[in-house]
Amino acid sequence: MVAISEIKSTVDVTAANCLMLLSRVGQENVDGGDQKRVFTCKTCLKQFHSFQALGGHRASHKKPNNDALSSGLMKKVKTSSHPCPICGVEFPMGQALGGHMRRHRNESGAAGGALVTRALLPEPTVTTLKKSSSGKRVACLDLSLGMVDNLNLKLELGRTVY
């Protein structure tokens, strides 16, 4: 049989332990039983408190050093621009200029895909939408357009489009 005084002392000790644990809520562990994990960089041995911080730091080892750029050890990046021969707009890459040149080409395929400027093309007709009695929008097209006579296709650069 267990004595009543023994049970009473066990309850008192348990209650005291609970009160001591509750009094430490929000404080760092002093006894070192559950230490925070430390993440160390394998390159420079710098320590971080989170894996994400270590990952961001590790990425900095992969970037080129700014000191090498300032001392001129790295090759100088050539900054060239590619101007459009028709309208003069400049592009940083030749590929962008090639995409831009499509704007100057005749999209209808007439004149063999030659370059034309928009100022020399006839004004496009605007299609108006009207509501019919049923409430639907209907496009009104003017089919009585005449041929464009004497269209001068001489470009500003002196080349003639055939």
From Swiss-Prot:
Its main location: nucleus. Keywords: Metal-binding, Nucleus, Repeat, Repressor, Transcription, Transcription regulation, Zinc, Zinc-finger. Disruption phenotype: No visible phenotype under normal growth condition, but enhanced tolerance to heat stress and increased sensitivity to salt stress. The keyword NADP does not apply. GO terms for molecular function: DNA-binding transcription factor activity; transcription cis-regulatory region binding; zinc ion binding. Expressed in roots, stems and flowers. One of its GO terms (cellular component) is nucleus. It is found in: Nucleus. The keyword S-adenosyl-L-methionine does not apply. One of its GO terms (biological process) is response to heat. Transcriptional repressor involved in light acclimation, cold and oxidative stress responses. May regulate a collection of transcripts involved in response to high-light, cold and oxidative stress. PANTHER family: ZINC FINGER PROTEIN ZAT12 (PTHR26374:SF384), ZINC FINGER PROTEIN ZAT5 (PTHR26374). This is Zinc finger protein ZAT12. The gene is ZAT12.
